[in-house]
Regions:
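Hydrophobic alpha-helical transmembrane segments
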Residues: 4-15, 106-122, 201-206
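Juxtamembrane "helix exit" motif at the C-terminal ends of alpha-helical transmembrane segments
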Residues: 1-2, 83-108, 197-216
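Membrane-proximal helix-loop-helix units in multi-pass membrane proteins
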Residues: 96-111, 116-153
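Membrane-interface amphipathic/juxtamembrane segments adjacent to transmembrane helices
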Residues: 28-69
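Transmembrane alpha-helical segments and their cytosolic interface motifs
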Residues: 64-88, 115, 176-207
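Alpha-helical transmembrane segments of helical membrane proteins, especially in multi-pass transport
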Residues: 128-197
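Cytosolic/matrix-facing juxtamembrane and C-terminal tails of multi-pass cellular membrane proteins
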Residues: 3, 148-157, 162-171, 218-245
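Hydrophobic alpha-helical membrane-embedded segments
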Residues: 10-38, 74-88, 119-142, 189
Length: 245
C-alpha cells in the first residue's frame, strides 16, 4: 500500500483545512465590500480619526495609539517565534513524540512520516503568521511616519482637498496594517485547529469548519459590530428644560 493510500483521510483533511482557510479569506474580502463588517466599519472610524487628527496641534495621543497597535503585533510576532522553536524541537524528536502520542487513548495512531508532515504543516502556518505580523509592524511604522508628516492647522498653503486626501491615505495605511494583523490572528485560530489533527482527521475537519463559523459570526454578526454601526437618536429634552423654555 502506497503512502497516499495509507494516509488518504489525512490528506483529505489537509485539503479541507486549506479550503476552509483560503475560502473564508476570499469570502470575507468579497462580502465586506458591500456589507457592514468589522473591517469596513473600523475603516470609517479610522478616516474620522485622521480627519480629527488634522484639527489638533498636539498629535502625541495619535502617535501613542499607533505605537500601542504596533506593540500588539510585535507581541504576537515574538510569540510566534517561540511557538516555532517548540515545533522544531518536537520535530527533531519526532520518534519519541509519536510514541508519546500513541500512549494517549483518544489519539488515532499515525505513522512517523505522517506525524512529521503534520508538524511541518503546523510550522508553515506559524511561519506565515510571523511574516504577517512582521509586515503589520512595518505598516504601522509607515502610519507613524504619516502622522508625523501630517500638515498642521496653521499651514495655509495646504488646501482642504489635500487635507482630505491625506486623511484618506493615512486611514488606508492603518487599515492595511490592521488587515495584516487580522490575517495573523486567523493563522493562530486555524493553527490551533491543527492540534486536533493529531487526535483525528475527522475532528480536524470539524474544528476547521467550526473556526470558519466563529470567524464569520464575529466579523459580520457580532454584538460589537452592532454597537459600532448603531447611530443614536436625538436625546429627548427633559421636562424641566421644556418648562424653562
Amino acid at each position: 500500500m502506497s503512502f497516499i493510500q495509507a494516509n488518504l483521510i489525512h490528506l483529505l483533511a489537509a485539503c479541507w483545512f486549506v479550503i476552509c482557510w483560503g475560502g473564508y479569506t476570499r469570502y470575507a474580502s468579497w462580502k465586506g465590500r458591500d456589507t457592514a463588517c468589522l473591517a469596513s466599519v473600523l475603516h470609517l472610524y479610522r478616516e474620522d480619526w485622521m480627519r480629527r487628527m488634522l484639527l489638533r496641534d498636539n498629535r502625541i495621543a495619535d502617535a501613542s495609539v499607533i505605537g500601542n497597535l504596533e506593540r500588539n503585533a510585535s507581541f504576537f510576532a515574538s510569540s510566534t517565534l517561540i511557538i516555532l522553536a517548540g515545533i522544531l524541537t518536537v520535530l527533531g524528536a519526532s520518534e519519541r513524540a509519536v510514541s508519546l502520542l500513541a500512549d494517549i487513548p483518544m489519539v488515532q495512531q499515525a505513522s512517523q512520516g505522517m506525524s512529521e508532515i503534520k508538524l511541518l504543516c503546523l510550522a508553515m502556518v506559524f511561519v506565515y503568521a510571523f511574516f504577517t505580523f512582521s509586515w503589520c509592524m512595518r505598516q504601522y511604522n509607515f502610519a507613524a511616519v504619516l502622522v508625523g508628516s501630517a500638515p498642521m492647522i496653521g499651514e495655509r498653503h495646504v488646501s482642504e482637498q489635500e487635507r482630505k486626501a491625506f486623511a484618506a491615505r493615512a486611514a488606508r495605511v492603518i487599515s492595511m496594517a490592521a488587515n495584516q494583523f487580522n490575517f495573523g490572528l486567523r493563522s493562530y485560530y486555524f493553527g490551533m485547529t491543527m492540534l486536533a489533527w493529531f487526535v483525528s482527521p475527522w475532528l480536524f475537519m470539524l474544528m476547521s469548519a467550526g473556526v470558519v463559523l466563529v470567524l464569520y459570526r464575529r466579523e459580520f454578526h457580532s454584538d460589537v459590530l452592532d454597537v459600532m454601526v448603531y447611530t443614536p437618536t436625538e436625546a429627548p429634552i427633559p421636562e424641566a428644560n421644556k418648562e424653562a423654555a
